[in-house]
């Protein structure tokens, strides 16, 4: 069972009574056939639920009102099978607060050249019925997605499925609670921000809990539960000699397991699905949570270090979006560069907290090593390299008057050498279009040093996310040129300033 099983998407057909009962009967039959086929053949993440035809303003308004108040409804897919006068949709669309997708399709793929008549034309009017619906969306300045293609087309299936992931993610975000253990890293700017504005814009809440409250829960974990979890570690990971039974760091592994169990219990009891820590506020914990955070991220929790609640929330959102897809998604940080003409590279990592969902190795190494930051006992961590291939790094920043999402398309590569003195998980990548352009554009746009790294999601996914939440997106990819990029930043400043 996944989070998508908790939601459904309503399939709504727009028509009118002008064409008579026989046409409406055929429309209903077509809709039933299409919905059944999509549910069985399209591999959509959510179930489509066919609703009664929308043929009058009252019927359409009722559907939109019911969608708003049904917690299982993640959004609406609308198909204008015949012409459906768009003034009938105004009241419903005015109140609709769920995501909306217009499926611009028709029942038949090919025209029946020898038999086509006006009855056929009246029945299959997506071509201009969809344009009428599009006008009222534009007139009302209402954001909605449009997918064009035959309902049996795999590309259309994939695009609808991708939109469904965004719709479910948006509903999950409205209920998301972010727990901050301690505050921000002192004097850091980009990890701070307006939590009230974030809740108004996205729906997630951010609150702080004392580390001492967490420590109480950690200390209540039984030795039996700790030992059972360590047994799981031994089956999932390659344990270094120091972490094995009778190893000199075995106690550190036991403490890491206790922290993991305590953190998970605290988060579950509070209904949290994202959290932050900071190495400057560890009072009562015996080590910086490293292994615990890595494993919780792999279970779907959002996380970021140093109190960075925006990145923690974004990671949770992207975890939901990517559920069931190939490839992982993790907290990440641009750490250091490798400058080599024609082969500039970025080494991404963090002190400890990189999600093993992006690991290249089937069994990461579990080790305990010294960490100078934090002033605590040596922490346990998983060590691995990252899968290779196309990926993205994304950053959500607070500009005061708006939120900006930055996305850099990257290509992860194999680490060419071992890193015997760097016992942390890492990712190595080439930034698009090149490191100088990518880094300069990122800096000019104010991108954070913390990001969400993903092999599972792509630029189109993040564009949909930005559109659905009505926020600015700034893209750095192979098409980026700095002069045009700077112009786009200036234009966006005017556009979003005008909208205030």
Curated annotation (Swiss-Prot):
CDD domains: L-arabinose_isomerase. Pathway: Carbohydrate degradation; L-arabinose degradation via L-ribulose; D-xylulose 5-phosphate from L-arabinose (bacterial route): step 1/3. The keyword Endoplasmic reticulum does not apply. GO terms for molecular function: L-arabinose isomerase activity; manganese ion binding. Mn(2+) binds at residues 306, 333, 350, 450. Binds 1 Mn(2+) ion per subunit. It catalyses: beta-L-arabinopyranose = L-ribulose. It is an enzyme of class 5 (isomerase). GO terms for cellular component: cytosol. HAMAP family: Arabinose_Isome. Homohexamer. Belongs to the arabinose isomerase family. This is L-arabinose isomerase. It comes from Escherichia coli O157:H7. The lineage of its organism: Bacteria, Pseudomonadati, Pseudomonadota, Gammaproteobacteria, Enterobacterales.
């Amino acid at each position: 069972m996944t989070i998508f099983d908790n939601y459904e998407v309503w399939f709504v057909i727009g028509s009118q009574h002008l064409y008579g009962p026989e046409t409406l009967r055929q429309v209903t039959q077509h809709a039933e056939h299409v919905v059944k086929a999509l549910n069985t053949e399209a591999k959509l993440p959510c179930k489509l639920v066919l609703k009664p035809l929308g043929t009058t303003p009252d019927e359409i308004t009722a559907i939109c009102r019911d969608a708003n108040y049904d917690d299982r409804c993640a959004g609406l897919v609308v198909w204008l099978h015949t012409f459906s006068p768009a003034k009938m949709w105004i009241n419903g669309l005015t109140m609709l607060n769920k995501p909306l997708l217009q499926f611009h399709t028709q029942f038949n793929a090919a025209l029946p050249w020898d038999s086509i008549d006006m009855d056929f034309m009246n029945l299959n009017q997506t071509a201009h019925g969809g344009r009428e619906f599009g006008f009222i969306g534009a007139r009302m300045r209402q954001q909605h997605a449009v997918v064009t293609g035959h309902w049996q087309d795999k590309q259309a299936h994939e695009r609808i499925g991708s939109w469904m992931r965004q719709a479910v993610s948006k509903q999950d975000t409205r209920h998301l609670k972010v727990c901050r253990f301690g505050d921000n890293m002192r004097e850091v700017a980009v990890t701070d921000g307006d939590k009230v504005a974030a809740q108004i814009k996205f729906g997630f809440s951010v609150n702080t809990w004392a580390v001492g409250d967490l420590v109480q829960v950690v200390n209540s974990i039984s030795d039996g539960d700790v030992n059972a979890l360590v047994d799981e570690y031994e089956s999932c990971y390659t344990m270094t000699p120091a972490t094995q039974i009778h190893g000199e760091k075995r106690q550190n592994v036991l403490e890491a397991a206790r922290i993991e169990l305590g953190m998970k219990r605290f988060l579950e009891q509070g209904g949290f699905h994202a959290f932050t820590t900071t190495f400057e506020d560890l009072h009562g914990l015996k080590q910086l949570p490293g292994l615990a955070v890595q494993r919780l991220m792999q279970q779907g929790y959002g996380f970021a270090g140093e109190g960075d609640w925006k990145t923690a929330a974004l990671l949770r959102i992207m975890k939901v979006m990517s559920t069931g897809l190939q490839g992982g998604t993790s907290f990440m940080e641009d750490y250091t560069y490798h400058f080599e003409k024609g082969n500039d590279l970025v080494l991404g990592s963090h002190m400890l907290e990189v999600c093993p969902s992006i690991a290249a190795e089937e069994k990461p190494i579990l080790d305990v090593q010294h960490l100078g930051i934090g002033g605590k006992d040596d922490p346990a961590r998983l060590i691995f390299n990252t899968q290779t291939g196309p990926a993205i790094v994304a950053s959500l920043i607070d500009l005061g008057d708006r939120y900006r999402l930055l996305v850099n398309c990257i290509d992860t590569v194999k680490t060419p050498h071992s890193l015997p003195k760097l016992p942390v998980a890492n990712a190595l990548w080439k930034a698009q279009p090149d490191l100088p352009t990518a880094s300069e554009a990122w800096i000019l746009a104010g991108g954070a040093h913390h990001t969400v790294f993903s092999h599972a999601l792509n630029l189109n996914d993040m564009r949909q996310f930005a559109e659905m939440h009505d926020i600015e997106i700034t893209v750095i990819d192979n098409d980026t040129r700095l002069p045009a990029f700077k112009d786009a930043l200036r234009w966006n400043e005017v556009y979003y300033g005008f909208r205030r």
